């Protein structure tokens, strides 16, 4: 709970119980943000929000009518204000845990879940993805394709209360969340109906890395040459790299059946085996290992962590069975 003048530069001091961008969930003494989305314009639901108890309306378009006893705050961009206010309302939870964001066209889920699984051997971890949220015994389906900012900040706040120390997050929209480590997997021509061109798509992915402060880490895939060249000179944080074809801090050499390979970390070379299939999964594993370096794990612990890496259910998953043929389950993008 916050007072309205803690969230906005206003003279009023009434208490705010909750914040919403969906009028169906608005309750007494709440703020309703009129987000103008791709398919729904929140300005059309002001009447519903006020009827259900909203005490403040944040809007950006001209209004024909304003209800008495309701505070109306006009802003240039409602979504930007929602991202800012949600972070404040829930007491900046992402600054209180180690936040690891994973972005790219594919591999986000696999890398984020692998990191969560590995780090769970050392500290209490949480995970926020496109499918669900997991932390401290809580498993909840995510009702959005991309976790909506209020939903995400509320759960991050709950993680802090439950003493979670680190979070891996699949990143599509990142405003309002502070990241310590950002990982890039790959980029290809997806969602060009939204971004328009490959250049705009890469610029959208690159924004995350420019927001990491000097103490943080950007982890880039050197095999994605165009994106690497776009980002490497624009960041202000530490840079770590991984790759198979191009020189990097962490590399896989002499790959055998996409299961065994020589792991090169700087000048150290070790033969390792991981239970994953596919060349792309070797790249995912390298991203996970590089994140361990960013967390400044001792080298022996980094090598130990390789033994904790497991494949993700349904993602090039090899099923064990007694019959004379191979069964692989792969039901969606990686």
Please tell me what each predicted stretch does.
Residues 61-63, 130-131, 187, 244:
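Short, ordered loop/turn segments at secondary-structure junctions
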Residues 16-21, 53-60, 168-170, 217-221, ...:
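Short, hydrophobic beta-strand segments that form beta-sheet elements in well-ordered domains
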Residues 31-34, 58, 168-170, 183, ...:
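Structural motif
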Residues 37, 189, 311:
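Short, conserved catalytic or interaction motifs in soluble domains
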Residues 13-14, 195-202, 206, 216, ...:
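Adenine nucleotide phosphate-binding catalytic loops in nucleotide-utilizing enzymes
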Residues 18, 137-141, 274:
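Short acidic, glycine/proline-rich loop/turn micro-motifs
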Residues 80-222, 226-236, 265, 286, ...:
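Phosphate-binding loop of NTP-binding sites
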């Amino acid at each position: 709970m916050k007072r309205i003048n803690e969230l906005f530069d206003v003279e009023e001091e009434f208490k705010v119980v909750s914040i919403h961008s969906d009028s169906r969930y608005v309750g007494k003494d709440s703020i309703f943000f009129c987000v103008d989305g791709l398919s729904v314009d929140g300005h059309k639901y002001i009447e519903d929000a006020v009827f259900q108890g909203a005490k403040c309306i944040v809007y950006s378009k001209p209004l024909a009518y304003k209800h008495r006893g309701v505070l109306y705050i006009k802003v240039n961009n409602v979504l930007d204000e929602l991202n800012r206010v949600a972070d404040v309302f829930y007491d900046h939870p992402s600054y209180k845990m180690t936040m690891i964001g994973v972005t790219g066209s594919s591999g986000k889920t696999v890398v984020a879940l692998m990191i969560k699984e590995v780090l769970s051997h050392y500290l209490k971890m949480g995970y926020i993805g496109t499918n669900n949220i997991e932390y401290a015994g809580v498993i909840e389906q995510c009702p959005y394709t991309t976790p909506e900012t209020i939903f995400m900040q509320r759960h991050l706040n709950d993680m802090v209360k439950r003493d979670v120390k680190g979070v891996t997050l699949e990143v599509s929209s990142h405003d309002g969340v502070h990241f310590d480590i950002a990982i890039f997997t790959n980029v290809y021509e997806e969602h060009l109906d939204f971004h328009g061109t490959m250049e705009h798509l890469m610029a959208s992915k690159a924004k995350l890395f420019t927001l990491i402060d000097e103490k943080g880490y950007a982890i880039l895939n050197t095999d994605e040459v165009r994106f690497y060249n776009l980002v490497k000179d624009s960041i202000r944080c530490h840079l770590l790299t991984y790759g198979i074809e191009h020189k990097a801090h962490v590399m896989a050499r002499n790959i055998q059946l996409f299961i065994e390979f020589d792991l090169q970390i700087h000048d150290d070379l070790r033969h390792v085996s991981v239970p994953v299939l596919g060349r792309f999964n070797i790249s995912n594993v390298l991203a996970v290992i590089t994140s361990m370096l960013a967390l400044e794990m001792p080298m022996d612990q980094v090598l130990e962590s390789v033994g904790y890496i497991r494949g993700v259910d349904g993602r090039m998953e090899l099923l064990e069975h007694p019959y004379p043929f191979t069964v692989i389950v792969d039901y969606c993008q990686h």
